[in-house]
Amino acid sequence: MKSFYVIANPHANLGKSQKNWEQIQNYLDEHDVDYQATETSVAGDAQTNIQAFLKNLDYADYEKYVVLVIGGNGTLNEVLTGIKEADVHDLPLAFICTSSHHQFADQLGIAPNPLVALKQILNATEAVQYSLIQYYESNHEETGYFLDNYSIGMAANLANLRSREHHHWLRTRCRWLANVIDICKAYYNSADAFSATLRIGHKYKFYKRAFIVNLQNRTQESDFSNNDQPIEVTIVDRVNIFLFLIFVATRKFGDPTKLPFVHHWRTDNLHITVNSLEQTQVDCRELGGKYNDLYLKLINYPFWINADSVSLEERRQK
């Protein structure tokens, strides 16, 4: 059996991840699993911790370890970025999602119940390659990655707002109302439209009233037939609050791409430019206000999971 280097974020999901981490730790101890663990306290810790671990890892141990990440997409993204920046060895990643944003985990077949997800990991005997998105940001000469999505504009503003929200009591008692309040705040905080330029293949597309730019990784979708076009691009124009709320409702109950102010494509590579300072986030990680000149492409990375090693009934457990 593999040994595990565990990076746990007990602060994920408003601190609820702490209980999940304790359950996982007890299970690992009770079943004599070989592991060493570290916890994160602030943003950036996961990236720092994995790079320190790799720096001290002997060459002979490269095939011994799996990195087990317990937290949200942001924590997993930090670990992935740290591994790629260290450029030592692509250690397989295992993931137990303890946040409320679990779309990427769902696409990989990872159970929402932490102990069931742990069984899927411990039952694995080999790594499985999954497709992620690599981006190169030319303004800052940075290379990064995203597992789920990269957002510019109002959607990033909304994600940043929720990470700092103070009405946690309202979110637990009346989630829909908390969501509406956050959406309205983010809408009015993102007052100005911005210009976005896309190059898909040899064609350029120009948008002068962009309000949301969202880039989504769709490579793992079980019903996705266009495997040669796994990057989903959505641009939403700036509209009044009433039309915007229609867009929000349509996202939940219908197909927003049919709205005249929503522009949608799928592609396998992309160049997108936003030459104004806009709020940006990647996999729920806040990047703050930045200029974006992005070149995107697919890469493969090894994940340590056997999704089919548990029953469908177990995989549906919360």
For the regions a protein language model found, what residue spans apply to each?
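ATP/NTP phosphate-donor binding region
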Residues: M1-V67, N77, L312, K318
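Short helix-capping segments at alpha-helix termini
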Residues: D29-D32, E85-L91
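Structural motif
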Residues: T38, V69-I70, A94-I96
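Short Gly/Thr/Asp-enriched flexible loops that form oxyanion-binding sites at enzyme active sites
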Residues: T75-V88
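Catalytic core of DAGKc-family lipid kinases
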Residues: D87-R209
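ATP/nucleoside-binding phosphotransfer catalytic cores, i.e., glycine-rich phosphate-binding loops
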Residues: I200-H202, S225-K318
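Glycine-rich phosphate/pyrophosphate-binding beta-alpha loops
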Residues: I212-F224
